[in-house]
Each structure stands twice: as C-alpha cells, then as structure tokens.
Amino acid sequence: MFRTENKKYGVSLLLAFMMIMFALTGCGSGSGEALDISKVTYVKSPGNQQNIEMYVISSDCTVKHYDIKQTSDKKIVIRDLFEGKLPSSEEYTVDSSKVSPEGWQQLENKLNETEFIYLSGDVSYTDQLMDEGSFFVEIQTGMIKHLAGGYNAGRGKDKDNKKFRSVTDILDNILADAG
C-alpha cells in the first residue's frame, strides 16, 4: 500500500510539474527562432483604389517605391502586384531610397515578435464605417513567402488586426524617415 501511494504521489507531482512548464513556456506555439527576412513588400490602396502605393524593402535597406495611378479601364488586382504583374509603364513611377539599418532591424524584430508568418492571409475588417482602403504586407525569407492583409486590414480590435497594425505602423514610420 505504501508503494502505491508513493507512485500516485510521484505521478501527480510529475503531471503538476509538466503543466507548470507548459504554462510557463507555451506548448510549441511558434518556432522560437527568428526569421531571417530578406524582403518586405507593403501595399496601400485607398478606398477609391485610383492610386496604389507599393514599397519593396530589401534587407540591404534599399526601398523601391511604386506609385501606381490607374488610368486605364483595366482594374488593377492588388494581389497580382505581389506576383510581379505591374500595369503598363505609363501607369506608375518608381523611385528609390533607403531606410536606416536601425529601421530595418526594428521592422524585422516586429515581424518576429508578432509571429507575422502565422497571421491569417485575410486580415480584413468589415465592421468599420470609414473606408480606409486595403493594406497588404508580404514577407519573404530564403525559403518562404507569406502574404497577409485585406480590406481595412489592421483596423479591427482582434488579435490578428492588432498584430498587423503594429507592423504597418512600423513600416509607415521607417518609410517616412527613408531618404
């Protein structure tokens, strides 16, 4: 009888220890390893979708800014931009600049902190009265690409919208300081 009680006590103690460890460290959510991000593409399209801004930021801190002005009757599909399908050259201009290395590091840290790679592809928020447009962010590493965003993305109060908004806030800040 004494041995059975000791075994029960030992098993109970082991289970309690395991539950405490899972509570403190999590149960395998996320890889824990920081992603080595090589490129971030950020697209902003206001509600009227006449002008679209696309920023391609590389790990060497270079920025290509595409200012797309839709002039033809052919509607621009935003997701096509991420596949390199730009409209005719008359419909956009391109300029180059650089973000600071600190700005790039801040962006990379935020993308890892928010576990952006695990965000849903559709972060749309349709309950808002104001039409702020569509926002998309694609991150690329040596092996993977992940695109998230949508209509009024980042404007909701749920967890994914808050994470998305924290990334676009950093993007807006570092792009405003780009030179």
Predicted regions and their residues:
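Secretory targeting and sorting signals
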Residues: L15-M19
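C-terminal motif of bacterial Sec signal peptides marking the signal peptidase cleavage site
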Residues: A23-G26
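A short-motif feature that recognizes glycine-rich, charge-decorated loops
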Residues: S72-L119
